[in-house]
A protein has these predicted regions:
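Hydrophobic transmembrane alpha-helices of multi-pass small-molecule transporters
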Residues: 1-81, 197, 201-331, 429-431, ...
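Membrane-embedded alpha-helical segments and adjacent helix-loop junctions characteristic
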Residues: 36, 49-50, 54-153, 301-306, ...
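Transmembrane alpha-helix interface/packing and boundary motifs in multi-pass membrane proteins
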Residues: 39-46, 123-132, 167-178, 260, ...
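Re-entrant/interfacial helical elements at transmembrane boundaries that shape
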Residues: 56, 102, 134-148, 163-164, ...
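Alpha-helical transmembrane segments of multi-pass inner-membrane proteins
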Residues: 80, 84-85, 89, 119, ...
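Membrane-water interface of transmembrane alpha-helices
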Residues: 91-97, 139-144, 215-226, 403-405
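Membrane-core helix-loop-helix motifs of multi-pass transport proteins
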Residues: 151-223, 234-235, 408-441
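C-terminal transmembrane helix pair
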Residues: 153, 199-204, 312-316, 326, ...
Length: 446
């Protein structure tokens, strides 16, 4: 009943826009399709992946694209790049290497509570750069709960500090690499960025935001850290078979090396910037060939819905550009923000992206907003359009205030140890701080 009602309302709104908004016909088609898809994505009336599959159907039916063009976005090279990321993550998880890395970092951090907690955040951040934010949080949550038990905190503020730190570390560090979070891939595809390009932007930004996040949580929550020393936090002896670990580690190192140095290597062998995706496919072949994992295991671990969401998002992005709908919406935003200066324009755009992400899928938010703000940047001429779109794409991963904002938030809230009002209080401050940091970095360095 709810699904039918939402589809009916979104359909009527889309028709209302098409018939009553003063604009060119192609632009009206783009706006109507965007409205229909955006409402379904934001409300999740249908599964996100299913709504993504509606995009090519609608754009072809409306006469905006032909079938081949519409469906070609579901074979975009960035989708194969992310598929390779899923394969690497599946292999690390199968051989317990992810748990080993997390445990090793935490044990090495030291026995003082603050060092152990910072080690927990650091391990979460490192894993989240290579594994999905959700999977990372699922891995680290039992470790965090074990640490809380060892510390005998008996303080809700301290528990919230530890648990929210894990969720927020996963969210933030996901922007560190191109495969760390789905919005990265959407943004990179729109801006033609490869793995190395993204690394030079995402990694420094994550390195700034993680300490800022810890500082905000400490300031807002005022945790009472016990002064007792902690015994060994994680048992890692025998966790990984040495022979398998070496094989997986070598393949992982080769793939990451090729990604980082993709520019000179691809030029040397005469392949364009999509070389990163070819490396990801090679990684899958090597992992299966050397029997570190079976294809069925990769298939089970892969979130195929996310890959379909990429295709729908990229098709929607292309449609917005071709119909002029993104330019139409950019003009509206410009009229409200451009008169207040470039900094306010960037800050307003970033905070809007963060706000939308609190209520909608971060991937869907990026798919909708990046092309609009790319057009806005081109229209204003006051700020590099790629920089504005990049800032908005990164901000799409930064919902900290609500349990529904990101899956890591929901997992932490599900423990029952963090009240929603605590998450809102800490998340609101962090949203503002992160928005300002992203804006400053984008303004001066992007």
């Amino acid at each position: 009943m709810r699904t039918n009602l939402i589809i009916l309302v979104s359909g009527l709104l889309s028709l209302g826009i098409y018939f009553f908004v003063p604009a060119e016909e192609n632009t009206l088609k783009g706006l109507a399709i965007l409205t229909f898809i955006a409402i379904l994505w934001f409300t999740e009336a249908l599964p996100l992946a299913v709504t993504a599959l509606l995009v090519p159907i609608l754009v072809v039916t409306a006469g905006v694209m032909d079938v081949k063009s519409a469906l070609s976005h579901f074979a975009n090279p960035v989708i194969f790049l992310f598929l390779g990321g899923f394969a690497l993550a599946a292999t690390l998880h199968k051989h317990n290497i992810d748990e080993y890395i997390a445990g090793y970092i935490m044990n090495a951090a030291g026995k003082k509570p603050i060092y152990a907690i910072l080690g927990l955040f650091g391990a979460t951040s490192l894993l989240s750069m290579w594994i999905s934010n959700t999977a990372t949080t699922a891995i680290m949550l039992p470790v965090a709960l074990g640490l809380i038990s060892k510390l005998k905190t008996e303080s809700p503020a301290t528990d919230a500090f530890i648990l929210l730190g894990v969720a927020y570390s996963a969210n933030i560090a996901g922007v560190g690499t191109l495969i760390g979070s789905p919005p990265n891939a959407i943004t990179a595809a729109d801006l033609n960025l490869d793995f190395r390009d993204w690394l030079f932007v995402g990694l420094p930004l994550a390195a700034i935001l993680i300490p800022a996040m810890v500082g905000v949580l400490y300031f807002v929550l005022r945790p009472k850290l016990p002064k007792v020393e902690v015994s060994q936090i994680a048992e890692i002896k025998g966790l990984v078979d040495r022979r398998s670990g070496y094989r997986v580690g070598l393949i992982f190192a080769v793939v990451v090396f090729l990604w980082i140095f993709s520019g000179p290597i691809s030029s040397w062998i005469g392949i364009d910037k999509e070389f990163d995706s070819l490396v990801a496919v090679l990684g899958i072949v090597l992992l299966v060939y050397f029997r570190t994992i079976e294809w069925k295991e990769i298939s089970r671990f892969t979130d195929w819905g996310v890959l379909l969401l990429f295709g729908g998002g990229l098709a929607l992005s292309a449609m917005l550009s071709e119909t002029g709908a993104s330019q139409f919406l950019a003009d509206i935003v410009k009229n409200h923000l451009s008169g207040h200066g470039v900094f306010v324009l960037v800050l307003g755009s970033v905070l809007l992206a963060i706000l939308i992400t609190e209520f909608a899928s971060n991937t869907a938010s990026a798919a909708i907003m990046v092309p609009i703000f790319l057009a806005l940047g081109q229209d204003t001429g006051q700020f590099p359009p790629e920089a504005l779109a990049l800032a908005v794409g990164i901000a799409s991963s930064m919902g900290f205030m609500l349990p529904v904002g990101t899956p890591p938030n929901a997992l932490i809230y599900g423990t029952g140890l963090v009240e929603q009002r605590t998450m809102i209080k800490a998340g609101l401050v962090l949203n503002i701080v992160v928005g300002i940091v992203i804006t400053v970095v984008a303004y001066f360095f992007f």
